[in-house]
UniProtKB/Swiss-Prot annotation:
Protein name (Swiss-Prot/TrEMBL): Keratin, type I cuticular Ha2
Coiled-coil regions listed in the entry: none
Statement: the UniProt record of this protein carries the keyword Isomerase: no
Matches recorded under Gene3D superfamilies: 1.20.5.170, Single helix bin (1.20.5.500), Vasodilator-stimulated phosphoprotein (1.20.5.1160)
InterPro entries, A to Z: Growth_fac_rcpt_cys_sf (IPR009030), IF_conserved (IPR018039), IF_rod_dom (IPR039008), Keratin_I (IPR002957)
Organism: Homo sapiens (Human)
Length: 448
């Protein structure tokens, strides 16, 4: 960039009244504005300081601290000015305008640099916002599906627990029912044993009655035989008496009528036979009734026993099935608890990783914010420098306007004058300190 193409519009408007001096630097020499210059000291007029922070020094300031060799003639011209100088007022005015042009070049480059930094800052902020949005999107994945899965597993666990509790209650009820049936079975068994004992007692009584009947029948036979013997003896006695009395002997005796033993015995026999028959019928009826009742009770008890046995078998099957289901539910519960534990461990590890990522991103955001604050501070410093430079330029413009009003135009600055008369190289009093706030020191051989 040449010094002639960097003059601002305001400075061009202020310099239209006076022609520009012809020098080597203003005729196309590549004189770069050095942003690292602290301030420029002139022997006739002390210029205010132009300070820039050392952070934004371009590479040209670090590699080269002097102007090119083609600019040494102009620097010699400016360096020859002092007390007792033979240059005219027009030459001094041209040197001052050249200095203002150089300052304008520096200001233009500085403004360009400021715009570039503003663009870079805007791009950096946009990138930071995009990165923060993307990181927020990547840092906050959708856990709703996992939460729904966890809720479903919890609901299944609760349902399984309720089912287990219901099965435990059913098992307890089945055990109580089995205990009741067992008690009923034992009561029926005791009743059956009592009935069998009664039947055995009745059978013994029946045997006794049968023996009594046999004894009575034997007695009846013996009585019949005795009656037959008595009849026979009576007939023999009657025959013997008839033989003794004769055929026609009639004896009239006043005595009680004779007793008919046969009739009496027949009556006794009939009575005893009737009694025995009645007793036999009564005993047979009672025995038959008892046997029928016992048979009915035995049949009922056997049916109930079969029903109880079938119920006990069914209950045992149900208990076995419930125990198998309970074991299966226990194993399912254990597997679900293991799965839940593994899921909790996995999610806790994922949450720890996410927390680490969040911590890292927060640290990065803190660093980015610190960088932004630092850049904002530097930007504020640049804005302050810009404002100070604008104030200095306004001051220089006012000084130039005052000088233009006081001094005549330089006749050597016509377009026909292409070069200036060289002068011997005298050391310049232009000093450029490296740091802000350091005093001026003369540069050797007129170099920056």
């Amino acid at each position: 960039m040449t010094s002639s193409c960097c003059v601002t519009n305001n400075l061009q408007a202020s310099l239209k009244s006076c022609p520009r001096p012809a020098s080597v630097c203003s005729s196309g020499v590549n004189c770069r504005p050095e942003l690292c210059l602290g301030y420029v000291c002139q022997p006739m007029a002390c210029l205010p300081s132009v300070c820039l922070p050392t952070t934004f020094r371009p590479a040209s300031c670090l590699s080269k601290t002097y102007l090119s060799s083609s600019c040494q003639a102009a620097s010699g011209i400016s360096g020859s000015m002092g007390p007792g100088s033979w240059y005219s007022e027009g030459a001094f005015n041209g040197n001052e305008k050249e200095t203002m042009q150089f300052l304008n070049d520096r200001l233009a480059s500085y403004l360009t640099r400021v715009r570039q930094l503003e663009q870079e800052n805007a791009e950096l902020e946009s990138r930071i916002q995009e990165a923060s949005h993307s990181q927020v999107l990547t840092m906050t994945p959708d856990y709703q599906s996992h939460f729904r899965t966890i809720e479903e597993l919890q609901q299944k666990i609760l349902c399984t627990k309720a089912e287990n509790a219901r099965m435990v209650v059913n098992i307890d009820n089945a055990k109580l029912a089995a205990d009741d049936f067992r008690a009923k079975y034992e009561a029926e068994l005791a009743m059956r044993q009592l009935v069998e004992a009664d039947i055995n007692g009745l059978r013994r009584i029946l045997d006794d009655l049968t023996l009594c009947k046999a004894d009575l029948e034997a007695q009846v036979e013996s009585l019949k035989e005795e009656l037959m013997c008595l009849k026979k003896n009576h007939e023999e006695e009657v025959g013997s008496l008839r033989c003794q009395l004769g055929d026609r002997l009639n004896i009239e005796v006043d005595a009680a009528p004779p007793v008919d033993l046969t009739r009496v015995l027949e009556e006794m026999r009939c009575q005893y036979e009737a009694m025995v028959e009645a007793n036999r019928r009564d005993v047979e009826e009672w025995f038959n009734m008892q046997m029928e009742e016992l048979n009915q009770q035995v049949a009922t008890s056997s049916e109930q026993l079969q029903n109880y046995q079938s119920d006990i078998i069914d209950l045992r099957r149900t208990v076995n099935t419930l125990e198998i289901e309970l074991q299966a539910q226990h194993s399912l519960r254990d597997s679900l608890e293991n799965t839940l534990t593994e899921s909790e461990a996995r999610y806790s590890s994922q949450l720890a990783q996410m927390q680490c990522m969040i911590t890292n991103v927060e640290a990065q955001l803190a660093e980015i914010r610190a960088d932004l604050e630092r850049q904002n501070q530097e930007y504020q410093v640049l804005l302050d420098v810009r404002a100070r430079l604008e104030g200095e330029i306004n001051t220089y413009r006012s000084l130039l306007e005052n000088e233009d009003c006081k001094l005549p135009c330089n006749p050597c600055s016509t377009p026909s004058c292409t070069t200036c008369v060289p002068s011997p190289c005298v050391p310049r009093t232009v000093c450029v300190p490296r740091t802000v706030g350091m005093p001026c020191s003369p540069c050797p051989q007129g170099r920056y």
